[in-house]
From Swiss-Prot:
UniProt-annotated location(s): Nucleus; Chromosome
Function comment: Core component of nucleosome. Nucleosomes wrap and compact DNA into chromatin, limiting DNA accessibility to the cellular machineries which require DNA as a template. Histones thereby play a central role in transcription regulation, DNA repair, DNA replication and chromosomal stability. DNA accessibility is regulated via a complex set of post-translational modifications of histones, also called histone code, and nucleosome remodeling.
Domain of life: Eukaryota
Provenance organism: Euplotes crassus
Protein known as: Histone H3
C-alpha cells in the first residue's frame, strides 16, 4: 500500500464556545491547582516487568522467615505436638517450598500463554498440577 501525505485540516462545524457564568471562581481554582504537579505514573505493566527482572536476578528468600516458621509449626502441630525444629531444617523447608512455588507459577504462566492469555487463572494452575501428575 502506497504512503500518502497527510495534510492539516481545519475543524469544520462543531459546537460554538459557551460563555461561562462563574469565570472568576473558575480562574481562582485553576490557578491553585496549576501549581500542584501530578504524581508520576508508569504505564501499566512497566513496574511488573521491572519486578520480574529484579526477582529473577535475586537469590534471596521471598517469603518472610518468621511467618513461614509459624506456618510450619502450625502444620506440624496437627501431626505431633511438642515438635522442635532446627533453624537449618526450617530454612531447608522454606527453600524447597519457594522452589516448588516458583516452578508451579512458571508452568501456570505457560498454561495461560497457551490459552492466548497473559493473566493466570486458577484453571491454569489446576491444569499445570494435573499435567505434573500431582492432582487427578
Amino acid at each position: 500500500m502506497a504512503r500518502t501525505k497527510q495534510t492539516a485540516r481545519k475543524n469544520v462545524g462543531g459546537k460554538a464556545p459557551r460563555k461561562h457564568i462563574g469565570q472568576k471562581s473558575a480562574r481562582k481554582t485553576a490557578s491553585t491547582t496549576a501549581g500542584m504537579k501530578k504524581p508520576h505514573r508508569y504505564r501499566p505493566g512497566t513496574v511488573a516487568l521491572r519486578e520480574i527482572r529484579r526477582y529473577q536476578k535475586s537469590t534471596e528468600l521471598l517469603i518472610r522467615k518468621l511467618p513461614f516458621q509459624r506456618l510450619v509449626r502450625e502444620i506440624a502441630q496437627e501431626f505431633k505436638g511438642d515438635l522442635r525444629f532446627q533453624s537449618s531444617a526450617v530454612l531447608a523447608l522454606q527453600e524447597a517450598a519457594e522452589a516448588y512455588l516458583v516452578s508451579l507459577f512458571e508452568d501456570t504462566n505457560l498454561c495461560a500463554i497457551h490459552a492466548k492469555r497473559v493473566t493466570i487463572m486458577p484453571k491454569d494452575m489446576q491444569l499445570a498440577r494435573r499435567i505434573r501428575g500431582e492432582r487427578s
